[in-house]
């Protein structure tokens, strides 16, 4: 049992009582309710829901700064994919731990990941105390033999993650994109998603080049093509990027309840474009936030994404009223929880105890009149305490689950292997 005393939460000073992995009570907590509770002093602190990053490639912390200032296809073909060919479980494990440290320190408690060597990722997630949805990244390049291997691996990893019996680690399916995956693979992904009741995590409409490739091959835009053979039917889908969209595609997204992972910083850095977020919001489409991998961002600080998502669309639409501060904050909290189907993203009784505490005695958080504005437009992301699944993962700036110095040392060692 954990008691956070006298913390600013949901607009006023209150106590938060945590029992097991859930929030038991918000309000005044009596002494008889907290026998043997660990007490955290919430004085001068605000409690916010843990942030939810809906599109990552976590081990790519080791690719940070490797290939900057390049277009997506050149970035992938000439730099990223050749380095990824050298990956193994150990490299992925240490890269993931490095990412978990970075996310915990910047208030992220849950992430939705697509990558390889999931045993290493799952081990790191388990040790760090984070919550994650993990998908094996599937690419068959329209080759039948490779397709069978990818589908076999995807199913193997779903069963592996389920066998861990860890409620913090959940499986998903991760077909990379329609320009790297065959129709046959994508159709089978839909079947597997229904069979195992897991979400689909996919890249869609990230660049004009990608859309052109799909149109040349199929005669249709990506969402229209996928919808033509029922890819979105009866499944929960998280579509990363969604930068260039036709009105017909947006109509499909609304009909099929597509969850969008908006990655504004990665899309800007790779010059992919700007997603039409105000248009998607007007249609009632669930918009969430992702950082993408560190190779294209180059960090995992979701507070930066919140700020950029709030200001970017004001600028490109010449309208200061679009994507208001609270709306942008919700992208990274309650909207992310909805996309991943977890009872989190809000500090409410009965919800998962994924809570972040921020010391308000910082110059950029004064005056204390409009804290939501400060969190979105002024905060740098350095949080003080992190609770995930009812466990204290970081206290007063010290991570309790991971040996940070060892991770930093091993990260350099793993990077040298990748660059050799």
From Swiss-Prot:
MF GO annotations: 5'-deoxyadenosine deaminase activity; 5'-methylthioadenosine deaminase activity; adenosine deaminase activity; metal ion binding; S-adenosylhomocysteine deaminase activity
One Pfam family recorded for the sequence: Amidohydro_1
UniProt key word Oxidoreductase: no
Keywords, ordered alphabetically: Hydrolase, Metal-binding, Zinc
CDD domains named among the record's database cross-references: ATZ_TRZ_like
Reactions it catalyzes: 5'-deoxyadenosine + H2O + H(+) = 5'-deoxyinosine + NH4(+); S-adenosyl-L-homocysteine + H2O + H(+) = S-inosyl-L-homocysteine + NH4(+); S-methyl-5'-thioadenosine + H2O + H(+) = S-methyl-5'-thioinosine + NH4(+); adenosine + H2O + H(+) = inosine + NH4(+)
Annotated residues for binding of Zn(2+): 55, 57, 203, 292
Residue numbers binding substrate: 84, 176, 206, 292
InterPro entries the UniProt entry points to: Amidohydro-rel (IPR006680), Deaminase_MtaD/DadD (IPR023512), Metal-dep_hydrolase_composite (IPR011059), Metal_Hydrolase (IPR032466), MTA/SAH_deaminase (IPR050287)
Record EC number: 3.5.4.41, 3.5.4.31, 3.5.4.4, 3.5.4.28
Pathway named in the protein's UniProt entry: Amino-acid biosynthesis; S-adenosyl-L-methionine biosynthesis
GO biological process per UniProt: S-adenosylmethionine biosynthetic process
Cofactor comment text: Binds 1 zinc ion per subunit.
Signal peptide as annotated in the record: none
Superkingdom, taxonomy of origin: Archaea
Family: Belongs to the metallo-dependent hydrolases superfamily. MTA/SAH deaminase family.
Role according to the record: Catalyzes the deamination of three SAM-derived enzymatic products, namely 5'-deoxyadenosine, S-adenosyl-L-homocysteine, and 5'-methylthioadenosine, to produce the inosine analogs. Can also deaminate adenosine. The preferred substrate for this enzyme is 5'-deoxyadenosine, but all these substrates are efficiently deaminated. Likely functions in a S-adenosyl-L-methionine (SAM) recycling pathway from S-adenosyl-L-homocysteine (SAH) produced from SAM-dependent methylation reactions.
Subunit organization: Homotetramer.
Miscellaneous notes: SAH is a product of SAM methyltransferases and is known to be a feedback inhibitor of these enzymes. As a result of this inhibition, organisms have evolved efficient enzymes to metabolize SAH via different pathways. The pathway found in methanogens differs from the canonical pathway, it uses the deamination of S-adenosyl-L-homocysteine to form S-inosyl-L-homocysteine for the regeneration of SAM from S-adenosyl-L-homocysteine. 5'-deoxyadenosine is a radical SAM enzyme reaction product which strongly inhibits radical SAM enzymes.
Name by which UniProt lists this protein: 5'-deoxyadenosine deaminase
Organism per entry: Methanocaldococcus jannaschii (strain ATCC 43067 / DSM 2661 / JAL-1 / JCM 10045 / NBRC 100440) (Methanococcus jannaschii)
């Amino acid at each position: 049992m954990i008691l956070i005393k006298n913390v600013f939460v949901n607009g006023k000073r209150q106590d938060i009582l945590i029992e097991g992995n859930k929030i038991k009570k918000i309000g005044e907590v009596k002494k008889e309710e907290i026998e043997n509770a660990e007490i955290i002093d919430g004085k001068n602190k605000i409690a916010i829901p843990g942030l939810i990053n809906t599109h990552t490639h976590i081990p790519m912390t080791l690719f940070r700064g490797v290939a900057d200032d390049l277009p997506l296809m050149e970035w992938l073909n000439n730099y990223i994919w050749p380095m990824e060919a050298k990956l193994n479980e150990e490299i992925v494990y240490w890269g993931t731990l490095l990412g978990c440290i970075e996310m915990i320190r910047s208030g992220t408690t849950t992430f939705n990941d697509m990558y390889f060597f999931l045993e290493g990722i799952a081990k790191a997630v388990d040790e760090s105390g984070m919550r994650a949805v993990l998908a094996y990244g599937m690419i068959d390049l329209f080759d039948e033999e490779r397709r069978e291997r990818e589908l076999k691996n995807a199913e193997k990893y779903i069963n592996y993650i389920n066998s861990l019996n860890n409620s913090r680690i959940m499986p998903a399916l991760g077909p990379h994109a329609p320009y790297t995956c065959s129709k046959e693979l994508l159709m089978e992904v839909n079947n597997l998603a229904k069979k195992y009741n897991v979400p689909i995590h996919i890249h869609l409409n990230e660049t004009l080049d990608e859309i052109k490739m799909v149109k040349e091959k199929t005669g249709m835009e990506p969402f229209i093509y996928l919808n033509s053979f029922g890819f979105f039917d009866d499944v929960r889908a998280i579509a990363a990027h969604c930068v260039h969209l036709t009105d017909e595609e947006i109509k499909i997204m609304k009909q099929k309840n597509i969850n969008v992972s908006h990655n504004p910083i990665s899309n800007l850095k790779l010059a992919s474009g700007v997603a039409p977020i105000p248009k998607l919001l007007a249609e009632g489409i669930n918009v969430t936030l992702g950082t993408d991998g560190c190779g294209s961002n180059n960090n995992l600080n979701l507070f930066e994404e919140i700020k950029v998502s709030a200001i970017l669309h004001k600028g490109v639409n010449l309208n200061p009223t679009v994507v208001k501060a609270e709306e942008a904050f919700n992208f990274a909290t309650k909207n992310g929880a909805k996309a991943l189907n977890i009872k989190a993203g809000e500090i409410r009784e009965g919800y998962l105890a994924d809570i972040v505490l921020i010391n308000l005695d910082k110059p950029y958080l004064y005056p204390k009149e409009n804290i939501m504005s400060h969190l979105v437009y002024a905060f740098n992301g350095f949080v003080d305490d992190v609770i995930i699944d009812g466990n204290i993962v970081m206290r007063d700036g010290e991570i309790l689950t991971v040996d940070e110095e060892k991770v930093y040392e091993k990260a350099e060692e793993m990077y040298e292997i990748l660059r050799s």
